Structure formats: structure tokens, C-alpha cells
Amino acid sequence: MSKRSADDATGSSCLVAAAAAGQPPIKKVHFEPHLIGPVSTLEEMDIKVLEFQNKKLAQRIEQRMRTEAELRHRIEQLEKRQTQDDAVLNVVNRYWNQLNEDIRVLLQRFDAETADELENRNENEVTTSFLAQLSTWDKEELDEKLANRVQVSKRAVAKIVQVIDRLMQRNEKITHVLKGDSLASAGSGSGAGAGGEEEQQQASGDAETTTSSAGVHALEETLKQTHIEIMSENHKLQNLNTSLHEKFHTMSLKMKEYQDAHTAKETENAELKNQIDELQYDLEKIHCRNDKLENHLAEAIEKLKAYHQIYGDPNKSTNSAKTPTTTGSGGATTSVNSQLLEELQKELEEYRELANNRLQELDKLHATHRETLKEVEKLKMDIRQLPESVIVETTEYKCLQSQFSVLYNESMQIKTMLDETRNQLQTSKNQHLRQIEVMESEELIAQKKVRSEMIQMEDVLALIRKEYETLRIEFEQNMAANEQTAPINREMRHLITSLQNHNGQLKGEVQRYKRKYKDTSTDNLKLRQELADALATLEGNKLQAATGAAGEEIKQENSTGVKEENSNNVSASGQTNQTNSGNDTNVAIKEENHISAEDEADDEASGKDVKDGIKQEKLSSGDAAAAEKKDSPGPGNSTSSATNSVPVKNEKDSKDGVKGKDVKAVESETVRDLKAQLKKALNDQKEMKLLLDMYKGVSKDQRDKVQLMATEKKLRSEIEELRQQLKKLQESKREERKKLADEEALRKIKQLEEQKYELQKQMANHKPTDNSWGSGAPGTANYTRPFVGSHEEEALLNEMEVTGQAFEDMQEQNSRLIQQLREKDDANFKLMSERIKANQLHKLLREEKTVLEDQMATATTQIEAMHIVLRKLEEKERSLQATVASIEKELMLRQQAMEMHKRKAIESAQSAADLKLHLEKYHAQMKEAQQVVAEKTSSLEAEAYKTKRLQEELAQFKRKAERMKKMEMSGTTIDEVMIEEIREYKETLTCPSCKVKRKDAVLSKCFHVFCYDCLRTRYETRQRKCPKCNCAFGANDYHRLYLQ
């Protein structure tokens, strides 16, 4: 980018661009204010402002003078270049015209029929001044005209080539003909010889044949020699052609290299031009700065001079400084007056020199003017006393003579025409009278016809009026009916618009439900994870609470009720497990049946029902698993109580391990369930997409019906789900009550087992070493525990083992049944999804089948249409062939006509060439006369310009002289005169009506200038006339004026 564009751009754009490019912002130009100094009155302030303005104007004038000098120098350079270009163009035009003339002469020499009207026209145009044509043409016209001229020259060259080709063909034909004649002559000679042998009687005929054969032989030899020479020349030309082709190839390669170099140089040239532009712009800036600095320097020097004149030089001796202030001030005033006088004297001397120079120029101009007047008078005398021979020899006299003869002949022809027209007028008058009589008779007949037609039209009008009345009545009836039906139509329109809005809202709700579905799926995953963590923590809390309660109740209960409570607890736990498993299976079966019924009832709302079924099943399976986990420690405790071999710590460790395993199994099961749900959700999403596509393909009425049905089904399904949830809540309450009873029984069993274990420990501690309880007191009986080592204890233990095994078998059976139920549910879900997919695929296939059938029908119709088009095209082809044959015949006729026109064009071209020569002579004479007139007019204009300039200077000198006379007469100084002039100027600038304010408004009617307030007050007070010329004006006739 050059610096001009950056400087010309606005401040805001520059700052933005600089901030975007990371460059510092461009500094703003600040103009220093001019200090006027202390001012006492408005007149002094105006004088100082005017002085400053005059200085600025002087600076601008100097700059303008410099720019004018530079531009003049540039104009001179451009004029020189233009003259050179004009000379080159003239040379090119001259040689181009000469080439066209030579080509035309060659064409006329070879074949007179090859000339063209366009070429003659172009030649006629070319003979006129080429530069004048170039100046009149635009860019587009110039390109077109020059291209046409180039095409003309190309055509001429092509015609020369055609002529040469024709000559070559003609020569070849001649050679072929001559060869054929020679062969025929040879054959005739051999036949004549045979006839001479057979008929030896005709000796004279033999002599003739021998002489003719000798002549033919000589011709053949000459033709052979010429043919050999032509062939050798042809070989030479071919060799030359090949060598020229080689040279052309090499030259073209060099040309390409030079072109590449040229393009590189052009790019360098463009870069250098840009640099030159930038440097020129910098140079202009520097010149402006230099001018400003020079002006500032000049002002500073003037101020220094004035300061030195007022206060004296500081370098002078101190004696001069010791002089009194009064003498210094008086000297300063005298020095100022002396300087002003010296400046005025210098100006007077300069004006005197200018006046002397102008006087000398005026004397010279007067002398030349007198000489020119003498020459003009001589020429006038010569023109008045011209001899007859000169007049007769002039071309103008000859032209007038020829025009007179032509006009005389025309006048004679016009006389004859007049006589003929008079005769025709008389005949036409007679015919006109006859026609008038005929017209009158026809008018009477037409009037009768019009009257009869008017009567008929009146009858028709009466019929039309009757029809109009009937139609009007029908129209009023229709209008009444329309007024009745109009509100119904409006209601229907409102209904349609409301339904359309409802459809749009439903579409938005569908998108919102999709988003909600995604959010609920993510929330579902999070809730499941939280549920698994909560279950794990609950199980741990329950186990801790159970162990703490068992430890407190051991001391309160006796060991006698252990067996009975254990047996009761075992039976109760078995029954609860069975009931729980039965309830779980029943719930799962019910849910499965419910899901299958809903899927069979409604295919469209299958996705939501399946998801709800999956959630319910997961909850039920989770409850069953939790119940199994809670019930599973029962048999382990019974076996431990029976064996009495494993301690409490080992049992706690084993319980913690089982808990960890159960938690991991729950987590793995939840992960698997979530993955399965994810797959099912994706399948449901695909199915919903298919349903959406199907929904889009259906019409609006069907969509509305489907939406209503779907909303009804959704509401019904929601009601059924709420009912199921109520049932499940009731069942869950029952199960929780049962679970609480089972947990209390298990706690009691654990408490009793722990009491039994502690009692056994106490028994072991209290047992003596010699196993004799009454050794200390003989005669006393030993106290023994009942059922120790008895059959009843063994039977109880066996029963306990059997019940534990039965409980384990029941648990295994329950788990197997749950797994089978899950597998069945998965299979049912898969079958249902496959069924939905199959139904959708069936629908899609049906639609594809219908689409393909439609395509087949359209294809068959297109094929039939193409067959019809083919037949039509064949018919058109036949008709076109017939038209082509007729056009060929017309072409033959037109070619013959063209040849005739070409011959006529050649004749007209010859006549045009003769006329061209005469025109050239006349143009040369005209140019000479124009040059003479232009020289004289330029000299006269220069004299007039000089006289005007002298008059202006004289007027200026007169003004200055009058000013000086006034000063001498009044005895005032220059300052007073200047003040008077300033006062006069101020008076001219003040408003003439109020004589207070400045002129700042102009009337567009009379162009008198006043202040804006005066004109506005005049307009408001209805005095709407100009104060000077009483010209009326309006609101739009006075405008603001800004004088500087």
C-alpha cells in the first residue's frame, strides 16, 4: 500500500486498522494557533486578522505559482511526446495506406473481380486526416475501427494468397491439359502411321501427320524443361519453407524467453513506479514543510527587523543605549516612515519599468497593426479589381457554371412538369366532382341503413335491460347468500389457522420431549448408581444393628427356649422366603402379561410401555435380590449353632466378604442392565425416527387424527400405569411388613444362638477337672444337663440340617426361576421389537413398491412421449431437407447476382478513385487556408489579450494614482487611507437595511444580499419585497450565504 491511501483514510479507520495490525496509532496533525497579541479595539483585531489572512493568501499564491510552473513544464513535456506520437502515427498510417494501395493494385492486376466495397470504403475513410479521426473516436470505437482496418488488410492479403493459389491451380490445369493433348497427339500419330502402311496411296496425308508430330514433340520437350525447372524451384521453396519454419521455431522460443523477461521487467517497473509515487508524495510534503518554514523564517526576520528598528541592535555601543527614551521612540517612528517611503519608491520604480515595457510593446503592436491594415487594404483592392481570366480559371467559377447548367436543366424539367401537373389538376377536378356526386348518393343509402340499424339496436337495448334487471336480482340474491356464508368461511379459516398453530406447537413439544428423554436417560443412570450405593450402605447398617441387639439380649433370655425358637424361626423363614418368591414371580408374571397386552394393543406407543416394563421388572428383581441377600445368612447361622465349632469373629469376616461380593455382583448386574437398556433405548430411538418419517409422509388431516388418537392412548396408558403403581405400592407395603417379621425372627435366632454359645462357655468354665461334681461332699448327686447326648438332641440337629438343605434348595430353585423369567422377558421384548420393525419395514416396502410403480408409469409415459417427439423430429428433418434444397437454389441465384454487383462495384470504385484525387486537391487548399486563418486569429487573440492586460494594469495604476493624489490633497498617512478603505469595505459587507449586521443571506429572485434576520423579519411581518428593487420573494427564495 502507498502512503497516499494511508494519509487519505479517515482517523477512525486508520486507528482501527493500526490496532488490528498491531502497529502504533497514527499521530493526528495539530495546527498551532496564531497569537494576535494585545488588542484594544475591534478595528485593531480586524486589521490583525486581515494581515494574517493576507499572509496566508500570499503563501497559497506562491504555492500555486510553483505548482503552475511545474504543471506547465509537465504540459510542455507531454506536448513534445504527443508531437512525437503523432509523427509516429502519421508514418504508420502513411505506410499502411501505401500497403493497402499496393495490395489493391495487385488485386486489380491479377483479378478485377476480387475487389470489395468495404475495402473501398475504408480507403476513402483512410484518406482523410487520421489524427482527427483518432481524436473524435472513443476507446471502444477506436478498438473497433482499428480492428476493422486490420481485418481489411488481412482480407486483402488473404485475397492475394487466393489469387496466387488460383494461378497455381490454373498452371497445374494447363500442365495436365497439355499432358493429355500430348498423349492424344501421340496416339493419333501412331494410328496415322498404321493407316499409311495399309494405305500407301495417300502420301500427302502422311506428310501432314509427320509435320504435326514434329511440332508436338518440340512442345513436349519445352514443357518437360519448364516442368523440371518448376519442380526444382518448388524443391527450393520447400527447403526454404522448412528452414524458415526452423527459424520461426527458434525465434518463437526466444520470443517466449523475452516475454518472460519483459513480464519480470514490467513487474519491476510497476514496483519502481509505486516507489516513485511514494517518493513524489514525500517530496511534496517536504516542499510544503519547507514553504511553511520559509514563511515562518521570513516572519521571524521581519519581526526581528522591526524589533531592531524599534529597540535598536543589541550589538551597538552602550552609548546609544544610554540615550533618553523619548528620542528612541521618536527615532523609531521616523525609521518606520522612512522604510515605508523607501518601499513606496521601489514600487514606483518597478511600476515605471513595467509601464515603459508595456509602452514599448504597445508601440510594436501599433506598428504591426498598421502593417496588417495596409495589407488588408491591398488585398481588398486586389479583390475588387480581379481580372476575368482569373475568375474563369478558378474552381469555384467552374463549380458555379456546372451548377448553373444543372439548375437550368432542372428548371426546364420543372416547366414541363408544371404543364403536366396543370393538366392533371383539371382531370382531377372533374373526377372530384364525379366522386362528390357518387358520395352524396352513397350517403343517402347509408343514412337509410343507419336508421334501420338504430331501430334494431333499440329493440336489442330493451332486451338487454330486461336481462340486466334479472341478473341484478340474481346478483342481490347471491350477495345475500354470500353474506350468510361469509361468517362460516371466516370461522373455517380461523379454525384452519388455529390447527396450523397447534401443529407447530406439537412439533415443538415433540422436540422438547426428545430433549427430556435424553435428560431422563442420563438422570436414570445416575439414580441407578445412587440406588446401588444406598442399598450397599443399608445392608451394612442393618448387619451392625443386628449384631448390637443380639449382644444386649443374650443376658436376658434362658437357654431352654433355644431349640423351640430355632425350629419356629426356621419354619417361619422358609415360609417367608416361599411367600416372597411367590409374590415376586406373581408380580413379574403380571407385569409381563400387562406389557404383552399393551404391545399387542398399540404398536405406536410400544417404546414407552417397554421402558416402563423394564423399569418395573428391574425394581422387582432388585427387591427379590435384596430379600435373598437378607435371607441367605439364615442357614449359615443354623449350621453354626448346630456344629458349635466356628467362632463369632470368623462369622463376621465371612459376612463382610459376602457383602463385598454381593455389592460387586449388584454393580455388575446394574452395569449389564444399563447396557441392555441403552441398546433398547437406541432401538427405540430408531423406531421413533421411522415413525416420524412415516408421520411426515401422511397428510394433515390424518396427522391430526393420529395425534388425537395418540394423546388418548397416552392418557389411557398413564392411567393404567398409575393404577399399577398403586398396586405395586400396596404389594411393596405388604412385602416390607413380611420382611420386617422375617428380620425380627432372624434377630431372635441370632440372639438365642449367642446365648447358647455363652452358656456352653460358662458350662465349660464351671466343669471340674476330674469330671466329678460332688466330690467335695460324698453322698450328694451330680447335676447333669437334660438332653445331653440324648436321641432327642440328635434328632433336632438332623432336622435342623434337613431344613437348612431344603431352604438352600428352595433358594436355588427361586434363582433359577427368576433367571428363566428374565430370559423369557428378554425374549418377549426382542420379539416385540422385531415385530414392530417388521411392521415398519412392511409399510416402507409397500411405499417403495407404490413409488416404483409410479416411476414405472411415468417412465412408460416418457417413453411414449419420446416416440412421439422422434416422429415429429423425423417429419421436421424431412421438411428441413426440402427447405435446404430450396435454399441451395436461392443461393445459386444470389451468387450470380453477387457477381453482377461486384462488377458494378469495381466500376464505382474506379469513379470513386477519380473523385478522391479531386477531393485531395480541395482538402489541401482548404488546409492551407485554415492554417493562414488560424495564424491570423492567433495573432489577433494575442494582441487582444495584451491590450486587455494593459487596460487592467492601467486601471490599477489609475486607482493607485488616485489614492496617492487623495493622500497628497488631504495630507493624511497611508494608515488613515487604509482605515478609510477598510471602513468602506465594512460598509459594503454590512446589511443595507439594518446597517448593523453582516450580510449572510441572498435572495434567489434578484440576488441582492442582506442579513438573514432582516429577511426573516420582513417575511414574518408580511413585507415580502426586496428593500432595493421591490421584487417579491417567498419562503424558499432567501438562503444563507457564508462570506470569508
Swiss-Prot record:
Compartment annotation = Nucleus
| InterPro entries for this protein | E3_ubiquit_lig_Bre1, Znf_C3HC4_RING-type, Znf_RING, Znf_RING/FYVE/PHD, Znf_RING_CS
Q: Which residues carry this modification: Phosphothreonine?
A: T242
Which positions are tagged coiled coil?
Answer: 43-81, 218-386, 417-546, 664-767, 794-970
Identify the enzyme class.
transferase
Disordered, as annotated region: 182-214, 312-335, 546-586, 615-664
Keyword Phosphoprotein assigned to the entry: answer is yes
Positions with biased composition (Polar residues):
567-586, 635-647
List residue spans of RING-type Zn fingers: 991-1030
Concerning its family, UniProt says: Belongs to the BRE1 family.
Specify the protein name. Answer: E3 ubiquitin-protein ligase Bre1
Name the encoding gene, please.
Answer: Bre1
